[in-house]
Amino acid sequence: MGGGYGNLDILKILLALLIVLRHIGQWFLFNNVFWHVYIINTISTIGVTSFFIMSGFLLFRKPVGKERIKKQIFRILKLYGCWTIVYLPLDIYKYLKDGLNFPQAIVDFVQKAIFNGTYYHMWYLSSLIVAICVVYIMKNRRCILITVTAGLMIIGIFTDTYGISFPKVYYTIFLTTRNGLFMGSFLVAIGKCLADYESKLRNLKKWKLILPVAIVALYVEGGLISKFDSERIINIAFTSVIVSIILVTIMIGLPQIKASKNVRNMSTVIYLCHPCIMVIINLSDHLGIFLNAGVKSFISMIMSILAALAVVKLSNKFKIIDNFM
């Protein structure tokens, strides 16, 4: 992320673990109504939402020109490419399982790589690139930036969360509205605004009072959506945006603690490696080792943390591993 904002480093690692809990629920506890409503469809939705805001803040807290944007996009592309290679065997296995021929698999892979992420959690990286570009283009027109991206966010939430659909041709090409244009651009724009007004974020009393109310509202919105559509998985809701903005604002405004580069890198690795860990844990059934959902969930969380620790530790000796963080 960048030095000098230790609070955000700590927040990012906590949110990465929250996202692991979300995906654990989707993998191993999919029949658990409590987990579905009170983790997956509510509090866990602030994870990636906050990532976008923090990324926008940290990028735009300094003057941003073409060279800096190019450098940032290249860094994200490199990270995206490295982890795409890691997950490529799983993608190939899925194509073989689904019976897709080689041309069909290539088209599907390229389409997902551009519009939806090469693996289900990788959408954040591809979306972040698009969101950064959108915000950079309008960075000197703050009112237009916020108005346009807020409109896109509203459309994105209504289509992805509330089930209002675009024409079928849109999804045939772009697959989803859970992307950098409709969801990421507004959040990165908010991060830029926080960077622009950072000096005014010291009066945190009102923010601290609003946060619990916003969290309650998040559970109300998520609970109501889940009640009317029990199978829907919420990615971002209106209240998760509000909670994320307040939470990141508070963490920026508080006195900053010192955090090492290792802490920053751990959160990235936890987020990017945990689906691979869960796939490995899930293979235990095929090996005749039958574990219940709770045990699989616990092992997945611990192994994700240990794997991240190992990768970060090895990166101090092998610089090539830096490409994965």
Model-derived regions, located:
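Alpha-helical transmembrane segments and their immediate juxtamembrane cytosolic regions
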Residues: 1-325
